[in-house]
């Protein structure tokens, strides 16, 4: 039976659109929460292969642990015959069927259900496949919605893993825009995307049909929102799973004492007076939230959220089985007992004869659970069920009894021990238990009364917690003051090693921390995970508690068991406000965690630009930006490796990071960016002045890497076209011709080739050889690309990089002055930020990228007459401000720009801005290629920055080693507080000059 079900899931699941599931532990492989993928195939009943819309393909678990949820199974073609969506009229419903539990015969398809059609207060049954068990869901009004992202209308895409449509897209790497999600076939809805390619072509492509993925998104789009917890888990027979073993529809009781329940409810929905009905009434599990807390509905119609540890599952006990437990008697029902009505229609009709008889209106009660309201003299039962009352034969119902066993789940042992302790305490009636409960509830009078009794232990525990800890977490300051007067142990630990100050940080109780500090509590105390209260406050996002702890002298840089400091945690939680507070308090940015990442590394790895901006703005020492990990990676290496462009820009421009640092493999950040084909990072590093000819441990330069990657991609394309291993030796010449031909087929379309050309155009050496004696050109079998590289390099050497344009710009002044688009009007529009002039004002709005340098056009300024003489048109570009407001004669007299008052460092002639060569000093030219304007000054700027860093580093070393009092002698005496001076100054002092603590002992350094 299990095998047939597994086979069915495997067949029916292929093509389903999925999102991450409840047991997901694979980081951002999918692109992040809400990103969508396609089930490609099943490796086994336990493993499924998914291709995410971002192109990542991997195996995931679908048995035992469940990594995926089904967002839409319509592409699989599963249909529910005889049904119709009552909103969009789809007939039959294909995919998941959503049936209203409160309306008669009302169904929705997946799109309409997640699109909030029908009443949001109504609960629905989810029917995943025809004939499968229907699952009752929480109403959508109370459920969490998240946004789906991936290949939807508006997404930018390239060809994907299953592409087989030749060059419809214009060639590998060409992009297109998804205009609509459509049906590949009538039996497979939502399984294709209609794409308009940049070359003008448009067509329909598979996204889910038979598990195929013709597309990969490079820029995802929103696909509407969906109810995450309502989506079925892929591979699971019953979607209502829960670590506590409870499922939607289960009957549950509360068998614990009121005070214990109230204690366990902290952090799990809390307790209100209206919940007293739950102590004597059996409820039905109607939902399981994202924190695995249980939502229970009661006969009154109320719904309450519970900690799973509070609830006991009620099992069905047949009357015959119960009778065996009695001594020769039959099962005796009592008023208030829960009973389940017999499922068998024919049997119950027979049993009801002479016992109230059978009525067709009783049909909905079959299999339902009700409560005994009255027991008649003939033993017949009056049962309240389904909102009405009926008389039943005792033999037609089964008694429902609570199970006596402990809760069984993954963390069951821990919960069982907790409950056992609670029961033991309950039975003993210990005063310590009453004290803890009173402290937790803020009952000052009761606490005062209990503390007067001689046999109470102020440090006694209940459920592993002391009164001090309970009061701290709940913010009961008055009780804390009472306990402190009784010499309570403020450092007492619970089972997790948490002290009262940890509990206060967890509960966001700044006032409690202040009281504990006055009571001499250790604010740097660590629990069993080596976390300080500051760690906990940062992780919970309690900014005021963080500030309070730091104000009272809490150490800002202690490490937990994983080596993370509060800085690491603030970066992970994306709390820039907390990060800034920690840095202002002197948190150490250089401390590394167990993986070797300091705070800068961590922010670069996470791709968190806002955190990086805060870190760089508050760095105590600028050279920290170049700190290496054990493997030699700096923060810039990590940003380049992971294509975090914004982070890399901050490191380069704000942090002045050294661009040429090498890791243990002697690779620079540029090596890594080229190797991973991260074009934007490559452009950023080259323009910032990264050296292009640094060799790694194999002697390879970035240009070697680019050409090797290009050649390998060409070979892979060749292998897709024919089986290379079977080519006969006689065909060898034609094979070489084919390899060469691939280069001419689309060299400029491939990012590796374009990166290689970009490097060559910016001066990369074509002749440098690696340790195998290979030059970059030796790694390129494509003669067309070799010629292009040589041409780019030659143009760079001859200073004509600007002539690398499709139009082959002539230096003829008339040609340079005419608009490159219409050729009718003269050029009169300045593009920013590149500073080129390529079009007239009429054509400029249509230009998105500069026609000379291919940079994105961010601003367009029409060139007016000279603001000084008003006789001629403005013809000189001022740098660095980028304004053109004066003619050649007037511009030569200016020291500052008349428009913005910025100092003029360079003057660029009009002809140079148009892409031509000026007859003036080359130092005044603006490059028309992809080279920064200030190329000449770059080396001097870098040298000055390096000298400044060294000066600051020397000053920092002096501050650490010199006596802070006299500033003349070396520090060679240390006090017990940790500070120090020189011996001469130290011998004359009675208190530390830094912290003002009394000097108890002086220790000389040797």
Swiss-Prot record:
Describe the function of this protein.
E3 ubiquitin-protein ligase that mediates ubiquitination of Delta receptors, which act as ligands of Notch proteins. Positively regulates the Delta-mediated Notch signaling by ubiquitinating the intracellular domain of Delta, leading to endocytosis of Delta receptors. Involved in ubiquitination of centriolar satellite CEP131, CEP290 and PCM1 proteins and hence inhibits primary cilium formation in proliferating cells. Mediates 'Lys-63'-linked polyubiquitination of TBK1, which probably participates in kinase activation.
Name the domain of life this protein comes from.
Eukaryota
Where Zn(2+) 2 is bound, by residue?
100, 103, 118, 122
Q: Which residues form a coiled coil?
A: 935-962
| Subcellular localization, as worded in the UniProt entry | Cytoplasm, Cytoskeleton, Microtubule organizing center, Centrosome, Centriolar satellite; Cytoplasm; Cell membrane
Keywords of the record, alphabetical order, are: ANK repeat, Cell membrane, Coiled coil, Cytoplasm, Cytoskeleton, Membrane, Metal-binding, Notch signaling pathway, Phosphoprotein, Repeat, Transferase, Ubl conjugation, Ubl conjugation pathway, Zinc, Zinc-finger
The identity of this protein, by name, is E3 ubiquitin-protein ligase MIB1
Q: What binding partners and quaternary form does the record give? A: Interacts with CEP131 and PCM1.
| Tissue specificity annotation | Detected in all tissues tested. Present in embryo, embryonic stem cells, bladder, skeletal muscle, bladder, uterus, testis, stomach, colon, ileum, trachea, lung, aorta, kidney, spleen, liver and vas deferens (at protein level). Highly expressed in testis.
Q: What is the source species?
A: Mus musculus
Q: What is the lineage of its organism?
A: Eukaryota, Metazoa, Chordata, Craniata, Vertebrata
Name where the ANK repeats lie. 430-460, 463-492, 496-525, 529-558, 562-591, 595-627, 631-661, 665-694, 698-729
PTM section of the record: Ubiquitinated; this modification is inhibited in response to cellular stress, such as ultraviolet light (UV) radiation or heat shock. Ubiquitinated; possibly via autoubiquitination.
């Amino acid at each position: 039976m299990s095998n047939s079900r597994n086979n069915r899931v495997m067949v029916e699941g292929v093509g389903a659109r999925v999102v991450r599931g409840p047991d997901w532990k694979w980081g951002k492989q999918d692109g992040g929460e809400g990103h969508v993928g396609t089930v490609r195939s099943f490796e086994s009943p336990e493993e499924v292969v998914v291709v995410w819309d971002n192109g990542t393909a991997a195996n995931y678990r679908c048995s035992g642990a469940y990594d995926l949820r089904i967002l839409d199974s319509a592409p699989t073609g599963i249909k529910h015959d005889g049904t119709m969506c009552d909103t969009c009229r789809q007939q039959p419903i294909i995919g998941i069927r959503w049936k209203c539990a409160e309306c008669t015969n009302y169904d929705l398809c997946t799109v309409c259900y997640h699109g909030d059609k029908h009443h949001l207060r109504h609960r629905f049954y989810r029917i995943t496949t025809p004939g499968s068990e229907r699952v009752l869901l929480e109403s959508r009004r109370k459920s969490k919605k998240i946004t789906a992202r991936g290949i939807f209308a508006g997404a930018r895409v390239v060809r994907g893993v299953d592409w087989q449509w030749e060059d419809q897209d214009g060639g590998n790497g060409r992009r297109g825009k998804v205009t609509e999600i459509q049906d590949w076939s009538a039996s497979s809805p939502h399984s294709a995307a209609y794409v308009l390619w940049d070359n003008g072509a448009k067509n329909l492509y598979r996204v889910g049909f038979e598990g195929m993925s013709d597309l990969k998104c490079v820029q995802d789009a929103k696909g509407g929102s969906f109810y995450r917890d309502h989506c079925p888990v892929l591979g699971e027979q019953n979607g209502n799973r829960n670590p506590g073993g409870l499922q939607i529809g289960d009957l549950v009781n509360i068998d614990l004492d009121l005070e214990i329940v109230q204690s366990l409810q902290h952090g799990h929905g809390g307790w209100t007076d209206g919940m007293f009905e739950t102590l004597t009434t059996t409820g039905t599990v109607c939902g399981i939230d994202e924190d695995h807390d249980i939502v229970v509905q009661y006969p009154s119609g109320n719904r309450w959220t519970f900690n799973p540890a509070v609830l006991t599952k009620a099992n069905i006990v047949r009357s015959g089985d119960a009778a065996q437990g009695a001594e020769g008697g039959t099962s005796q029902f009592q008023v208030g007992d829960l009973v389940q009505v017999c499922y068998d229609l024919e049997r119950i009709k027979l049993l009801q004869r002479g016992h109230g008889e059978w009525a067709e209106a009783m049909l909905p009660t079959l299999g339902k659970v009700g409560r005994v309201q009255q027991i008649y003299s003939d033993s017949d039962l009056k049962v309240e069920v389904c909102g009405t009352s009926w008389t039943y034969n005792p033999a037609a119902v089964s008694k429902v009894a609570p199970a006596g066993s402990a809760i069984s789940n993954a963390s069951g042992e821990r919960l069982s021990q907790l409950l056992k302790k609670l029961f033991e305490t309950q039975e003993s009636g210990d005063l310590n238990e009453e004290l803890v409960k009173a402290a937790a509830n803020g009952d000052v009078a009761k606490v005062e009364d209990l503390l007067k009794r001689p046999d109470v232990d102020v440090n006694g525990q209940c459920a592993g917690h002391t009164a001090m800890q309970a009061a701290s977490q709940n913010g009961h300051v008055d009780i804390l003051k009472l306990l402190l007067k009784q010499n309570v142990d403020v450092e007492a630990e619970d089972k997790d090693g948490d002290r009262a100050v940890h509990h206060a940080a967890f509960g966001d109780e700044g006032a409690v921390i202040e009281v504990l500090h006055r009571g001499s509590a250790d604010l740097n105390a660590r629990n069993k995970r080596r976390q300080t209260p500051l760690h906990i406050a940062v992780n919970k996002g309690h900014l005021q508690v963080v500030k309070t702890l730091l104000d009272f002298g809490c150490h800002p840089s202690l490490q937990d068991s994983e080596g993370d400091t509060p800085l690491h945690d603030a970066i992970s939680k994306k709390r820039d406000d907390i990060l800034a507070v920690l840095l202002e308090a002197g948190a150490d940015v250089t401390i590394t965690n167990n993986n070797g990442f300091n705070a800068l590394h961590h922010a670069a790895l996470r791709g968190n630009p806002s955190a990086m901006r805060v870190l760089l703005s508050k760095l105590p020492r600028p050279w920290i930006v170049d700190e290496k990990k054990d493997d030699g990676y700096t923060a810039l290496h990590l940003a380049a490796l992971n294509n975090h462009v914004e982070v890399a820009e901050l490191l380069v421009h704000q942090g002045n990071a050294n661009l040429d640092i090498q890791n243990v493999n002697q690779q620079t950040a540029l090596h890594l960016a080229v190797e991973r084909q991260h074009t934007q990072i490559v452009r950023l590093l080259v323009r910032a002045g990264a050296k292009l000819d640094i060799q790694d441990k194999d002697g390879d330069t970035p240009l070697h890497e680019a050409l090797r990657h290009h050649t390998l991609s060409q070979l892979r394309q060749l292998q897709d076209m024919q089986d290379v291993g079977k080519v006969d030796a006689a065909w060898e010449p034609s094979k070489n011709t084919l390899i060469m031909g691939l280069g001419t087929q689309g060299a400029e379309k491939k990012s590796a080739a374009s990166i290689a050309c970009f490097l060559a155009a910016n001066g990369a050496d074509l002749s440098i050889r690696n340790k195998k004696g290979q030059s970059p050109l030796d790694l390129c079998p494509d003669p067309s690309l070799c010629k292009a590289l040589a041409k780019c390099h030659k143009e760079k050497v001859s200073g004509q990089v600007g002539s690398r344009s499709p139009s082959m710009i002539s230096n003829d002044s008339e040609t340079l002055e005419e608009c490159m688009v219409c050729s009718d009007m003269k050029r009169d529009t300045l593009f920013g930020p590149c500073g080129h002039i390529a079009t007239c004002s009429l054509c400029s709005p249509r230009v998105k990228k500069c026609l000379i340098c291919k940079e994105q056009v961010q601003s367009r300024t029409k060139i007016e007459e000279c603001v000084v003489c008003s006789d001629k048109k403005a013809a000189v570009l001022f740098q660095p401000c980028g304004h053109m407001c004066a003619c050649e004669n007037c511009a030569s007299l200016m020291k500052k720009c008349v428009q913005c008052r910025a100092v003029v460092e360079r003057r660029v002639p009009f002809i140079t801005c148009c892409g031509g060569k000026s007859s003036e000093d080359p130092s005044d030219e603006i490059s028309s290629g992809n080279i920064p304007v200030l190329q000449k000054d770059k080396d001097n700027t870098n040298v000055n920055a390096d000298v400044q860093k060294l000066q600051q580093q020397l000053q920092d070393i002096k501050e650490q080693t010199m006596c802070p009092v006299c500033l003349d002698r070396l520090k060679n005496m240390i006090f017990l507080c940790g500070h120090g001076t020189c011996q001469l100054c130290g011998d004359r002092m009675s208190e530390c000059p830094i912290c003002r603590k009394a000097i108890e002992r002086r220790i000389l350094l040797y």
